[in-house]
A protein has these predicted regions:
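Conserved helicase core region in the C-terminal RecA-like lobe
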Residues: 83-92, 265-272, 295, 406, ...
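Helicase C-terminal subdomain and adjacent C-terminal extension
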Residues: 677-697
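Conserved helicase motor core of SF1/SF2 NTP-dependent helicases
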Residues: 27, 264, 271-348, 356-360, ...
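Accessory N-terminal region flanking or inserted into the helicase ATPase core
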Residues: 1-23, 27, 31-32, 50-52, ...
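Helicase P-loop NTPase motor core
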Residues: 26-33, 37, 41, 322-325, ...
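Accessory C-terminal helicase-associated subdomains
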Residues: 455, 460, 487-490, 497-624, ...
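P-loop NTPase Walker
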Residues: 1-102, 288, 341-344, 666
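ATPase/helicase motor core of nucleic-acid motors
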Residues: 319, 365, 394-537
């Protein structure tokens, strides 16, 4: 790569004005940012110039710091450039402005804070009070909603009245963030703070009034109380800093000078900011009267599920009330020429974007192919072949990534590679194998495996009780368990499979009144259908169909990630290779779990340099692939309803999904394999439209 190419030089030589730098992946963004600081430093040679470079991850911060420290070309600006994450900048402000601040970082502290510290506040708000007193575990959801409102730009000091609340809601809808509000309102309904809205959708203002009176007024008081008591969440690192910085800017009698002043603020990955991030950046820029440079790529805006929006980088003048000069880095130094071409061909199907003419620096081309497989077993064989090429005994291993759209897609590959002793890295922050409910699913399979064995009555009773506990959505309470256990001990035989009638004959309360034993019969039927299954795959399918306690449940997902997307389909399809060998299936799952007990740090801010990360095989979702690169990328299940996800309905959602696919396959340096499937489980699958858009089908 040359020192600076033409597009990089144009950016670096620009006058000291507000700039939007569009920086596609692999175009030398880090180098360009630091050379820009050098150029501005030279322009202001008569006085010291200070730069604030804000990143959103520790990894990005460390990359910039390393380049600044190690490259002698940047020696002249080392003492003038501050590089930090937005959260770290905010926490430094908290420490300077409060005494003995307490940061809420674990579950117990958060629970205590809501349940006890905020008790005088929620006691005055009936809807919140009733929800907490009915189920104290709701504290987690309540604190998360409080943080989400801050992230969405609600302000307890300026947005107080119902009119101000409604106006901000409309602003968020205009920013295409209305869906995020709907998620929050649905959560408030599920935890019992709000009642359900009319099915016909009429009277939206009436519903917003209930949100305001039922929860938002509590949020105003609770947020104020926590700040006054120096108690902060991670989101408060930015929220407190924003309010404090804005107030200092408004109270200032004269501009900042000297070492206290930033002359230039540079914001990296600007396409991934949310309303709170924007507010804090604006407050810093306005107080310091600094220029601002917004660096990012609207085509890589893939974190909208966090409440971010690409609108900010598409229309910066609208939010900063200033003119911006736009520069675009035009040379991709990372990717082979044909990957750059296909990426451009794909992303140009999006309408809401800034068009870019990105050219490849490399003349070499990657191997690109589409592989259609019959089912998951054929897909595993394909992956094994690719992996074998990267772990040859006579050479150094190279890195390959298997990238899925959903976490559940990765589970069969985790089990398969672990059972084959293939070292891999599954750096997922939501490890479903480590959930308590997944352990219970395995326990049910163990019960199935021993169902025909003769055992002591109390052991049979315990197994039946475990099965009954997961038939319905909510588990049995202690009183129901005691009565049912007593009944089983008097009624069961030596084998579980011979004792199902003991469930049907029970007449006590069971997940409700159990009138005429109807509920008992339902329980018995569900258990019988499960125990009658022959193969491992059939047993898993029976659990998914008849055991509501294992079904998807977004309310329960707050406590256990298993419920967000139960992996029954993937497990059942994978389990077909085991036939009726339950023990081998369970052994392989346990091997995979043991492997995953040593997963690397999973925070987005974690460095990418530890020993586990250096393993040759990486399994990840597309959202975790951003910023990484591999010799080979295998994109899993390139079919409709996966790429794009089936929830996508609107133009904006389809464009967001296209950006995710764009990010996924552009991680490759030498080879991309798009794996399509004829079937996903029992469903016939059609190839993803994106393969047609880039001309591969």
């Amino acid at each position: 790569m040359p020192k600076l190419d033409k597009s990089q030089q144009a950016f670096c030589d620009a006058p000291a004005v507000n700039i939007r730098l569009l920086a596609p992946a692999g175009c030398g963004k880090t180098l360009s940012i630091l050379h820009r600081c050098c150029a501005l430093h030279r322009l202001a040679s008569s006085r010291a110039t200070r730069f604030l470079v804000l990143t959103f991850t520790v990894a990005a911060r460390d990359e910039l710091k390393a380049r600044l420290t190690e490259d002698p070309e940047f020696a002249s600006i080392r003492d003038h450039v501050e590089i930090t994450t937005l959260n770290a900048w905010g926490f430094r402000r908290i420490k300077s402005q409060t005494r003995n601040p307490r940061l809420l970082t674990n579950k117990d502290n958060k629970h205590f804070t809501i349940l006890n510290q905020l008790a005088p506040v929620w006691a005055k708000h009936k809807a919140v009070k009733d929800a907490i007193e009915k189920r104290s575990s709701r504290t987690k959801e309540i604190l998360e909603i409080m943080d989400a409102l801050k992230a969405l730009g609600f302000d307890h000091t300026r947005i107080k009245s119902a009119e101000e609340f409604n106006a901000h809601v409309q602003d968020l809808i205009d920013l295409e963030l209305g869906w995020r509000l709907e998620e929050l309102w649905e959560t408030l309904i599920k935890i019992g703070i709000l009642t359900s809205r009319p099915k016909d959708g009429n009277d939206p203002q009436g519903f917003l009034k209930r949100v305001y009176t039922g929860f938002y007024k509590f949020w105003l008081e609770a947020t104020d109380q926590l700040i006054k008591s120096a108690t902060f969440t991670l989101e408060d690192q930015k929220y407190f800093a924003f309010i404090d910085e804005r107030q200092k800017g408004e109270d200032a009698d004269k501009p900042l000078t000297g070492v206290a002043k930033y002359d230039h603020v540079i914001v990296d990955e600007f396409q991934d900011i949310n309303p709170l991030d924007l507010n804090l950046v604006k407050a810093i820029v306005e107080r310091h009267r600094a220029t601002v440079t917004l660096v990012g790529d609207d085509d890589q805006a893939i974190y909208e599920w966090r409440g971010t929006t690409p609108v900010y980088i598409l229309e910066p003048e609208r939010f900063f009330a200033s003119r911006f000069k736009t520069f675009t880095l035009q040379t991709n130094y990372r990717s082979p020429a044909n990957i750059v071409t296909l990426a451009q061909k794909l992303i140009r199907h999006n309408q809401r974007r800034v068009d870019k003419d990105t050219q490849a620096f490399q003349t070499a081309e990657a191997e690109i192919r589409v592989e259609e497989t019959e089912d998951i077993n054929a897909s595993l064989d394909l992956a094994a072949e690719l992996v074998a090429e990267h772990i040859k005994p006579d050479g150094s291993p190279t890195r390959i990534a298997l990238i899925g759209r959903k976490k559940a897609q990765l589970i069969p590959y985790q089990v398969y590679f672990a059972s084959k002793n293939v070292p891999f890295c599954a750096a997922e922050d939501l490890q479903i194998f480590l959930s308590k409910t997944f352990d219970q699913l395995l326990e049910l399979l163990e019960i199935k495996q021993r169902a025909d064995q003769r055992r002591r009555p109390r052991e049979v009773a315990a197994d039946l009780l475990e099965l009954c506990n997961l038939v319905k959505r909510y588990r049995l309470n202690n009183a129901q368990k005691e009565q049912l256990d007593g009944h089983f001990r008097r009624s069961v035989f030596g084998k579980i499979c011979d004792s199902i009638d003991a469930v049907a004959s029970y007449r006590g309360p069971l997940a409700g009144p159990n009138v005429g034993g109807r509920t008992s019969i339902e329980f018995a039927d569900a258990i019988r259908s499960y125990l009658d299954a022959t193969t491992v795959a059939d047993a898993i399918t029976a659990l998914s169909c008849n055991f509501e306690g294992l079904a998807a449940d977004f309310g329960k997902a707050e406590e256990d990630i298993f419920f967000k997307d139960p992996p029954f389909g993937q497990l059942a399809e994978y389990a077909q290779r085991y036939g009726d060998d339950y023990l081998q299936f369970l052994d392989d799952i346990e091997t995979a779990k043991d492997h995953l007990a040593h997963v690397p740090p999973t925070d987005d801010e974690a460095p990418d340099s530890n020993d586990v990360q250096k393993r040759p095989v990486h399994l990840m979702t597309a959202l975790r692939a951003k910023g990484k690169e591999f010799e080979t990328v295998m994109v899993l299940d390139c079919v409709e309803d996966m790429w794009p996800m089936k929830y996508a309905q609107t133009l904006a959602q389809f464009e967001a999904e296209r950006r995710v696919f764009y990010v996924a396959f552009t991680r490759a340096k030498k080879r991309v394999v798009f794996q399509t499937a004829k079937r996903l489980g029992k469903r016939t699958a059609a190839p993803s439209r994106y393969l047609s858009e880039i001309g591969l089908l």
